[in-house]
């Protein structure tokens, strides 16, 4: 027969291939699929594979000019989700050639670009991605990574302490710098611009940069410790963002900050390259993540956004707090914390990790615990996150009845007490409150903080 068979086609004939052996170079994806009533799971899984790779809704003449077998995504396994009716995990393998090297932007446009609006699906969630080593090697990754950061800061054997300056909107640059100085002087390692502090009428970015730099050099001179303030370089255009980053470098500060989801992966990767070339650390905030990751059956899990950030580049990223949440969430959070920090992470479904991930020596990212935490949480945080983390107390520092500096002192004393207790072999989970109480006998600042935030 001449020509080809026209017409709308069944996806599963071409894109559902249960005998496919995945290649080491494939990008693997685990999707949680909720098909519309009457759509078989194989067809739904195949539709996802097709729509996110070579497929289109009908047979086209130009299909004859290419090798589908070489370029198509394949749904190679489907399993029902325990405890949910009509939900399936569809595993899809994508050939590496479908993706541009070193572009998180292109990876996401391909894998999650179009398929989420697909009619045959009621909902779709990307749960995990396996990034093959061949693709990982096309990315620079974090500007410096955990070890280099410790060496730059000369801080070892403990988590780092931070604080977001509040009220986040409305302070003048001079008063903002003053708040930064008080916190750093009191014993914090870092202070942070809030994610929505960019360059507003009440405080233009250059004024803030200047006063914050002054504050941190003064605190550095007085304490003999290296200090940092995350200067938020996020801006409306990439050019403006780079201008801010360059200004930070000229001031000689150690670290800048970026909102990677609202700023976009292209901007973030550009900034990460600049940071490595110019010796700046890069702190990443995840504003907008809940828009993408909060629904259990639709969107993308945060572990995917975290992996994407490690490829794109950042030295710190916000990762939730775990404290006071459900146990299950603790395991899941620790799963993606390991994916950020470790070089090799084994598949472990109980921790939400669908694929073994080998990062082939890509530098690690330090997770940042932030949001609603205070001194009584310190033992749990030290135990859960370990040394390679930043613990960020905004209200938990600035809410201290005696002011910012005593608030900073309280947090530092609590942290040092927890680290010492851990190193002496005490059980932080069981004796946490006792450890904090003992320490507060020697520190009136900590005692006052313990009073304000009673567990």
From Swiss-Prot:
The modification N6,N6,N6-trimethyllysine is found at residue 5. The active site is at residues 166, 285. It is found in: Plastid, Chloroplast. The keyword Iron-sulfur does not apply. It comes from the Eukaryota. The record marks 325 as: Transition state stabilizer. Its EC number is 4.1.1.39. One of its GO terms (molecular function) is magnesium ion binding. Substrate binds at residues 114, 164, 168, 286, 318, 370. The modification N6-carboxylysine is found at residue 192. Pfam families: RuBisCO_large, RuBisCO_large_N. One of its GO terms (cellular component) is chloroplast. Mg(2+) binds at residues 192, 194-195. Binds 1 Mg(2+) ion per subunit. Gene3D superfamilies: Ribulose bisphosphate carboxylase, large subunit, C-terminal domain (3.20.20.110), RuBisCO large subunit, N-terminal domain (3.30.70.150). Its cofactor is Mg(2+). Its main location: plastid. Keywords: Calvin cycle, Carbon dioxide fixation, Chloroplast, Disulfide bond, Lyase, Magnesium, Metal-binding, Methylation, Monooxygenase, Oxidoreductase, Photorespiration, Photosynthesis, Plastid. The disulfide bond which can form in the large chain dimeric partners within the hexadecamer appears to be associated with oxidative stress and protein turnover. GO terms for biological process: photorespiration; reductive pentose-phosphate cycle. The basic functional RuBisCO is composed of a large chain homodimer in a 'head-to-tail' conformation. In form I RuBisCO this homodimer is arranged in a barrel-like tetramer with the small subunits forming a tetrameric 'cap' on each end of the 'barrel'. Belongs to the RuBisCO large chain family. Type I subfamily. Heterohexadecamer of 8 large chains and 8 small chains; disulfide-linked. The disulfide link is formed within the large subunit homodimers. This is Ribulose bisphosphate carboxylase large chain. The lineage of its organism: Eukaryota, Viridiplantae, Streptophyta, Embryophyta, Tracheophyta. The gene is rbcL.
């Amino acid at each position: 027969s001449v020509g080809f068979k026209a017409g709308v086609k069944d996806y599963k004939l071409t894109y559902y291939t249960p005998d496919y052996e995945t290649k080491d170079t494939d990008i693997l994806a685990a999707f949680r699929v909720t098909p519309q009533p009457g759509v078989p799971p194989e067809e739904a899984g195949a539709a996802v594979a097709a729509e996110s790779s070579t497929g289109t809704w009908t047979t086209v003449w130009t299909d004859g000019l290419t090798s589908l077998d070489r370029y198509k995504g394949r749904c190679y396994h489907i399993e029902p989700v325990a405890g949910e009716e009509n939900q399936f995990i569809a595993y899809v393998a994508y050939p590496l050639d479908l993706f541009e090297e070193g572009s998180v932007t292109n990876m996401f446009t391909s894998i999650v670009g179009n398929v989420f609006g697909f009619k045959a699906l009621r909902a779709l969630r990307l749960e995990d991605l396996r990034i093959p080593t061949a693709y990982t090697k096309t990315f620079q990754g974090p500007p410096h990574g955990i070890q280099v950061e410790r060496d730059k800061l000369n801080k070892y054997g403990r988590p780092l302490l931070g604080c977001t300056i509040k009220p986040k909107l409305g302070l003048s640059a001079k008063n903002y710098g003053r708040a930064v100085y008080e916190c750093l002087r009191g014993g914090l390692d870092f202070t942070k611009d809030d994610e929505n502090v960019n360059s507003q009428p009440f405080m233009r970015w250059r004024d803030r940069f200047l006063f914050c730099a002054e504050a941190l050099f003064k605190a550095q001179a007085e304490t003999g410790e290296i200090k940092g303030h995350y200067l938020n370089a996020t801006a409306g255009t990439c050019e403006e963002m780079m201008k801010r980053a360059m200004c930070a470098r000229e001031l000689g500060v150690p670290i800048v900050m970026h909102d990677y989801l609202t700023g976009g992966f292209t901007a973030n990767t550009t900034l990460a390259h600049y940071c490595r070339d110019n010796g700046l650390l890069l702190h990443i905030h995840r504003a907008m993540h809940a828009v993408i990751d909060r629904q259990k059956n639709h969107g993308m899990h945060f572990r995917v956004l975290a992996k994407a950030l490690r490829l794109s580049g950042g030295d710190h990223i916000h990762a939730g707090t775990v404290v006071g949440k459900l146990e299950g969430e603790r395991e899941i959070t620790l799963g993606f914390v390991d994916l950020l920090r470790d070089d090799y992470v084994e598949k472990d479904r109980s921790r939400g990790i669908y694929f073994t991930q080998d990062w082939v020596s890509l530098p690690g990212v330090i997770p940042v615990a932030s949001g609603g935490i205070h001194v009584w949480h310190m033992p749990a945080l030290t135990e859960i996150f370990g040394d390679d983390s930043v613990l960020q107390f905004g209200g938990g520092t600035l809410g201290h009845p005696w002011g910012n500096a005593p608030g900073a002192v309280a947090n530092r004393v609590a942290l040092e007490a927890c680290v010492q207790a851990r190193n002496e072999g005490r059980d932080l989970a069981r004796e946490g409150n006792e450890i904090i109480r003992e320490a507060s006998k020697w520190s009136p600042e900590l005692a006052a903080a313990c009073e304000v935030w009673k567990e």
